[in-house]
Amino acid sequence: VAATLAVTLPLQAQEAELRQIMEQAKRACDQLGICVVGGHTEVSRAVHTPVITATAVGKREDFCEAQHGNPEELDLVLTKWIGLEATSLIAAEREKELAARYPLSLIRRAARFEVYLSVASEAAIARKSGVYAMHDVRNGGIFGALWELSRKLGVGLTVDLQKIPVKQETVEICEFYDLNPYELLSGGCLLIAASNGEKLVEELAACE
């Protein structure tokens, strides 16, 4: 398996920032057994924050086929917490603003949520368990993911909002900027439709 990375940086970016990006990319690829074989780097006034595009190729082994069953009888399982990606980005970029209300310990803890952004491990567990569908929660937040999954399954969904996990740091940042946590960028969170949700939750918990 190999990948190439195209990195576009804002004009004011420093070499140290590019070095940090590449070190993080290498760590992530090493964890997944991926080799970075090439790429491209440029600076542009069109971006205000680094933009990284990854293209990966690999060998086809076997596909994860959807489990047969009635979509009206499925359980919904959500991994980690919603809003992790947005919380991490905002905390890292708006530390001074947030520090007017919150302690630095909370802000920097929120910025470190970036370590939760991979869904590879839970997707692998869900794949082995045999699930009906999986959806990487990102743009549009959990509300967007639920809508897209509902359309894919062709059914309506019954969801208890009180059971959707969200970090307190996310709640605080949402209150500060008047944001809806259910619509936040939520990379690192995987929405799964399974015939036996309790069994899947146990399998996910056993691998934490």
Question: Where do the language-model regions lie?
Answer:
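Helix-biased detector of long, well-ordered alpha-helical tracts
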Residues: V1-E208
